[in-house]
């Protein structure tokens, strides 16, 4: 079902006022693309349906990675590419969160702050994985950066999927200890992660006052690890929820009041058991918050490490899968086509069934 309101609608309302928000040219470029997505401004295709024999216009998408309308097909492509990479082992979901003291630096030096987050998270897992007391094997990790909270505030954190074990020096698989109930002690991981992250920032060009470091060392850092998945089948589908997710989906926008220039959207209160609530912001404040999560140009927000890195998988993954007796795992496919404009089989309004569309021309 198509959402009633979209981020593009809100951008359309404030298009003449965007310059007053103090955004960068990179922000404006992304917002401009989102506002034009799947409109006449992007051009499109004229398709003829062999079911209803009507012509249908399919406008092109902007394909910007921050666009709420364009993420569905990218997520499906990513999931399909991961199907052949699963191992027949338990997987854990680990979340590394930055304290709010670094938020202002994330806005001004996003590449450094976010890259350091990836590095520190992987270094933390490596330290525990390499230690025979905890595992004694080379680990792997798929990490996805999210920068938002439910209210669109800045809340940088990494969602990581980690196989429950690693490769010994002899090349044999070693299962995670603790009877598979948890990966490593999260309290210990939090302390190591804090040290690793601060060390990365100190090595960077960022000049952060010592009082900021004192403040972050005086508080507990959040590292959260969920219990293992029921089976590898659920791993990629689960991570697929996070890979191409953006700050807010169009479906969360409950109301757009054009006259008063107000936006109401739904949010979950995780401190209250995920209870749903509604928030109302001015359209300008909504856009300002949305723009907080436009990543720096060229920044890679999904990264693979260790035995899940591209180089390692290409050379050694088939052998490890054979050792672990990994079977081909079928992932449930969505019925939504990868791209509405380019799809061969789609369902159009007033059509009774999924039908073949013939591309009969460009707009």
Predicted segments — roles?
Residues 1-363:
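Beta->alpha loop/short-helix hinge microenvironment recognizer with preference
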């Amino acid at each position: 079902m198509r959402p009633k309101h979209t981020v593009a609608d809100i951008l359309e309302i404030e298009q003449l006022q965007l310059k007053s928000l103090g955004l960068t040219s990179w922000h404006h470029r992304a917002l401009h693309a989102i506002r034009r997505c799947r409109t006449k401004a992007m051009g499109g295709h004229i398709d003829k349906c062999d079911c209803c024999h009507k012509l249908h216009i399919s406008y092109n998408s902007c394909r910007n990675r921050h666009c709420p309308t364009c993420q569905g097909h990218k997520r499906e492509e990513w999931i399909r590419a991961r199907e052949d990479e699963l191992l027949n082992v338990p997987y854990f979901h680990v979340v590394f969160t930055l304290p709010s003291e670094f938020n202002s630096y994330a806005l001004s030096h996003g590449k450094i702050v976010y890259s350091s987050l990836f590095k520190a998270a992987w270094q933390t897992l490596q330290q525990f994985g390499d230690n025979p007391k905890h595992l004694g094997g080379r680990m792997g990790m798929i990490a996805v950066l999210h920068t938002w909270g439910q209210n669109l505030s800045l809340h940088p954190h990494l969602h990581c999927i980690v196989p429950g074990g690693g490769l010994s020096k002899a090349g044999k698989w070693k299962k995670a200890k603790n009877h598979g109930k948890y990966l490593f002690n999260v309290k210990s991981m939090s302390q190591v992660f804090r040290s690793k992250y601060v060390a990365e920032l100190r090595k960077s060009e960022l000049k952060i006052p010592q009082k900021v470091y004192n403040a972050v060392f005086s508080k507990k850092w959040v590292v959260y690890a969920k219990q293992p998945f029921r089976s590898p089948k659920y791993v990629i589908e689960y991570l697929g929820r996070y890979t191409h997710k953006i700050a807010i989906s169009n479906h969360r926008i409950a109301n757009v009041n054009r006259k008063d220039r107000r936006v109401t959207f739904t949010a979950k209160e995780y401190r209250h058991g995920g209870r749903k609530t509604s928030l109302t912001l001015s359209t300008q404040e909504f856009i300002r918050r949305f723009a907080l999560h436009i990543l720096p140009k060229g920044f890679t927000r999904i990264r693979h490490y260790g035995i899940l890195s591209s180089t390692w998988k290409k050379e050694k993954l088939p052998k490890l899968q054979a050792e672990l007796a990994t079977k081909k795992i079928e992932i449930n496919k969505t019925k939504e086509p990868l791209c509405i404009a380019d799809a061969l089989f789609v369902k159009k309004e007033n059509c009774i069934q999924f039908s073949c569309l013939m591309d009969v021309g460009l707009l």
